Amino acid sequence: EITTRLVGSEMCIRDSYTGALDELFDCQFGRLPYRSLRFDFEHYEKESYQGHSVVNYTVSEDFTRITEFKYLTGQKNTDGTTIVKEYPFAYTGAEGEIPYYAILEPKNQELYEKYHALAGGLPHFYLLGRLAEYKYYNIDAMTKKAMELADAIMAENTKR
């Protein structure tokens, strides 16, 4: 626990962690498996590429999604359109790679629980998000959870 004095009153620091939990502990039990993504941007000199903002692909292509940005931003530009194709690959922790999605299998959950137990020993330390909690969240659920955590921390502070 970190305490500090601010204008004569004691204050307890609370930490919320949103990064990969295995990396916080230097992968001492092994690396948690994640799916990463490579993004390939392409520009086309035509009004539209696919007619929709996002099209998901399951098995027909090597990429999993194409996003055409003009439909997300409301652009009226008719001189061209830009898309991005998302290609999945296994996250290895190499420089420049980003872990995006937990690979939710029982053996991976068991490994996560080891790291979770280590984090549980840290006072006033809160895990939040896809990487720290090793689960998938939609943005609306994640926003709600973050606000609930903030409320809980504020309520805890008023008890002190």
Q: What spans do the regions from the language model cover?
A:
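Single conserved hydrophobic/aromatic residue that forms the stacking wall/gate
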Residues: 1-13
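Short glycine/serine/threonine-biased micro-segments
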Residues: 6, 17, 127
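Glycine-/small-residue-rich beta->alpha transition segments that form the dinucleotide
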Residues: 14, 18-23
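C-terminal segments that line or cap access tunnels to active or ligand-binding sites in enzymes
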Residues: 23-159
